[in-house]
Amino acid sequence: MFKKTLSMICCVIFLQGCSQEQEVKKEMTSMETALLAATEKQETNTVILLLKKGADTNITDSKGRTPLMIATYKNDVKTAKALIEAGADVNIQDDMKNNPFLYAGAEGYFDILKLTIDAGADPSLTNRYGGTALIPASEHGYIDVIKELLTRTTIDVNHVNNLGWTALMEAIVLSNGNETQQQVIQLLIEHGADVNIPDNDGVTPLEHARAHNFEEIEKILLATNK
């Protein structure tokens, strides 16, 4: 009889423990859902409150986006800063293979880029095209972003993406050759860009510059090869 009673007591205690654990998990899930929603709405104060209550900074939504990734997509610097200060992982990539560092570099979101670098972003991670943050930044002519990447990270200036393009190549092929792009080319070369790396078809940056009639860029490339 005693053993049976003891067994029943243990069972009740176990079930109570399970119930409490389930309640905690339910509460945490609710907080994480609220955190994602608050980030989406750019409600920074609510985000901060939820973080103080213990919400998981690295929870992901149905698209694999963390709250920090959502804030980055919206260029919401204030919320991004709060999330990073709370320990958000800046290297987590979503289903599109974007992460805060990669996307901020590609879109020219300078302030968020700096925050991710300060938080230990991995510059070797690549996007869905196999490119580093430097490649799209060079295409778009984001001078400040390019300088930040080249001077504050160990990013590979000669990394080749899936198309066979380096940052230098992309800055030629996908640009209009204006003064900003000329500055980009010069900046990349000053930081070790190899002007002779061809694309997957064996076409060099110089040949592409000539094909686009980018005379000033052609001069820069020729001067580098002297």
Residue ranges and their predicted role:
Residues 22-70:
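N-terminal segments that cap or nucleate solenoid repeat domains
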Residues 43-51, 76-84, 109-118, 142-151, ...:
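Ankyrin repeat structural motif
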Residues 37-42, 70-76, 103-109, 136-142, ...:
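Ankyrin repeat A-helix N-terminal signature
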Residues 195-226:
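Leucine-rich solenoid repeat scaffolds
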Residues 16-17:
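C-terminal motif of bacterial Sec signal peptides marking the signal peptidase cleavage site
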